[in-house]
Amino acid sequence: MWGDKMRYFPIGVFDSGVGGLTVLKRLMEVLPQENYVYFGDTRRVPYGDRSKEEIKAFTKQIMNFLKKKNVKIFVIACNTISAVFEKEGKEIVFNVVEAGVKSAVETTCNKRIGVIGTRRTTEERIYSNKIKEINKSIEVYEVACPELVPLIEKGFYKTESVKRVVIECVKNLKEEKIDTLVLGCTHYPIVIDYIEEALIGENVRIVDPAERLAYDVKEYITRVNMINPNGSGQVQFYLSKMTQSFIEIAKILLEGKINNYNVSIVDITKY
């Protein structure tokens, strides 16, 4: 389908910051032989309170940058970007929302699904709309948790402040008797322990869209014969600003895949 050499090109993964590392982790578990290029917009995070126009402009810059890195597919590892993304070219693009929607519909038994995400994601009602396209009888309750991403990006992901925010975020969803909760932001798996604790005794199954996404990507590149036959799982990281929390979280999630030699700073506004 594509030129044979493209199978050796890396997979491009991008997010507003550290959240996309949870997606990269899943991809590397499912496709360990692939090489990856990761971009985190750590200078302009969070995206959740930005306008659609800003997010679209930032996304275009990031994708232009990743094209220069010869990525064979793009993985949008950010729900906020996914919620406003409009495909323009012929690029192969996967996003977490599509995967999360499919997983949520397959998971729910009582047809009551909760979604926690950024303000932009929940205001777009992207999960509600796409879930109802599949099954109109499913009720979807979306709650914005705007405080979480800034706290996680600052490195406060194991604090009482985060715990309190999580409890407040899921409180109303528990009252709606949901049986499925979608993590509608890729930062949230980083605080999964607090989320699970807040849901103890509620018999709620948690959906991390990245799990389905990784297998969707694998299925696609296998089908079009684009699996890298001799890759080594290398990752090149690019950030718009160096932050200690990014390095710390990457070391925890990716277990040795990040060091001083594979992290570069890029002025993304030039793209």
From Swiss-Prot:
Q: Which Gene3D superfamilies match?
A: 3.40.50.1860
* Enzyme active site: C78 (proton donor/acceptor), C185 (proton donor/acceptor)
Q: Where does substrate bind?
A: D15, S16, Y47, G48, N79, T80, T186, H187
Which UniProt keywords are present, listed alphabetically? Cell shape, Cell wall biogenesis/degradation, Isomerase, Peptidoglycan synthesis
**EC category:** isomerase
Catalytic reaction list: L-glutamate = D-glutamate
Superkingdom assignment: Bacteria
- Tell me, what's a Pfam family for it? Asp_Glu_race
EC identifiers of the protein:
5.1.1.3
Could you tell me which pathway this protein works in? Cell wall biogenesis; peptidoglycan biosynthesis
Q: Which family does it belong to?
A: Belongs to the aspartate/glutamate racemases family.
Please give the function described in this protein's UniProt entry. Answer: Provides the (R)-glutamate required for cell wall biosynthesis.
Name of this protein? Glutamate racemase 3
Q: What organism does the record attribute this protein to?
A: Caldanaerobacter subterraneus subsp. tengcongensis (strain DSM 15242 / JCM 11007 / NBRC 100824 / MB4)
